Curated annotation (Swiss-Prot):
One of the components of the core complex of photosystem II (PSII). PSII is a light-driven water:plastoquinone oxidoreductase that uses light energy to abstract electrons from H(2)O, generating O(2) and a proton gradient subsequently used for ATP formation. It consists of a core antenna complex that captures photons, and an electron transfer chain that converts photonic excitation into a charge separation. This subunit is found at the monomer-monomer interface. Involved in assembly of monomeric PSII from the CP43-less intermediate. It is a single-pass membrane protein. This is Photosystem II reaction center protein M. Keywords: Formylation, Membrane, Photosynthesis, Photosystem II, Reaction center, Thylakoid, Transmembrane, Transmembrane helix. It comes from Synechocystis sp. (strain ATCC 27184 / PCC 6803 / Kazusa). The gene is psbM. InterPro entries: PSII_PsbM, PSII_PsbM_sf.
Amino acid sequence: MQVNNLGFIASILFVLVPTVFLLILFIQTGKQSES
């Protein structure tokens, strides 16, 4: 099965963007609760 390059990149971005967004929120809330 040949994977479309653009579709492959889109799939990675589709997973990566929300993950990074959640990580940033998690780190910010963690720092706030510490102080």
